[in-house]
Amino acid sequence: MEMKNIDFILESDEALKPSERLVLLLLEKHRMLYTNDLLALSNLSYKTLTDALTALVLKSYVLKETGKGRRQNCYRLV
């Protein structure tokens, strides 16, 4: 699986909405984030966040390592 790099994210300015660029930059830095973490870091609404994530990232429904058995959406770069 190829990772998008930060140069690609910054150069593809016209192709991406600001919210999409922000999400990609956050994932480039952190490699993997859960929904609540992305919401907190990006300050985007849930709808804007999920719209930005739709085609750009790999989503999986996983057990959070620090959680008490609750499953959460986890996002990584595709």
Named regions from a protein language model:
Residues M1-E11:
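Long, low-complexity, charged/polar intrinsically disordered regions in eukaryotic proteins
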Residues I9-E20, Y34, E65-V78:
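Short, cationic-aromatic polyanion-contact patches
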Residues E14, L27-H30:
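Short helix-capping/hinge SLiMs at alpha-helix to coil transitions
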Residues R21-L26:
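Pre-recognition alpha-helix immediately N-terminal to the DNA-recognition helix
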Residues M32-L41:
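Short acidic, hydrophobic short linear motifs in intrinsically disordered regions
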Residues L44-V57:
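Short amphipathic alpha-helical interaction segments
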Residues V57-G67:
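A short, conserved structural fragment
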